[in-house]
């Protein structure tokens, strides 16, 4: 898996997941960063990630409830990562969620133009300052919410060997 072993092909059956991973790794190679390895066991965490943003199949727009949902889910995700043996940093994971409130949902949409795509790739590599240096493991799922496709991606550091 992403503990340094050779990378297996993406197990996801969605071609868009493979395309996103390929694009990310190309971007990372160009920047001299390590490539990401697909990690199947992280896919379930994408469910936790998307849950605050969706209610009954529609995007959530109630800002007041929203931030408390997100905090709860972030704690759950941190706990789940920790349980699975992944390191928790100050910037412990980079999810396909932008920085601002319900606008976060917009950053989950797969980028349609080149500028958006570059922003997504930069964000998924730890932001402008590449804050998380040793990102290694990637998982992603594609969801249709209110008739639009959203990409829920998670990037974390390498597992800590026991």
Give the positions of each predicted feature.
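Short, well-ordered surface patches within globular domains
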Residues: 8-79
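A well-ordered secondary-structure block
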Residues: 68-162
């Amino acid at each position: 898996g992403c503990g340094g072993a050779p990378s297996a092909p993406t197990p996801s059956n969605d071609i868009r997941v493979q395309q996103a991973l390929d694009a990310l790794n190309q971007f990372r190679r160009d920047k001299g960063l390590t490539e990401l390895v697909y990690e199947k066991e992280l896919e379930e965490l994408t469910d936790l990630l998307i849950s605050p943003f969706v209610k009954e199949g529609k995007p959530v727009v109630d800002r007041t409830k929203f931030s408390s949902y997100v905090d709860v889910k972030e704690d759950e995700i941190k706990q789940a990562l920790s349980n699975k043996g992944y390191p928790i940093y100050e910037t412990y994971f980079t999810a396909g969620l932008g920085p601002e409130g319900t606008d976060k949902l917009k950053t989950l949409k797969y980028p349609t133009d080149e500028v958006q795509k570059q922003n997504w790739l930069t964000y998924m590599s730890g932001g402008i300052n590449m804050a998380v240096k040793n990102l290694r493991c990637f998982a992603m799922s594609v969801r249709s919410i209110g008739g639009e496709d959203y990409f829920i991606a998670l990037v974390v550091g390498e597992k800590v060997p026991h």
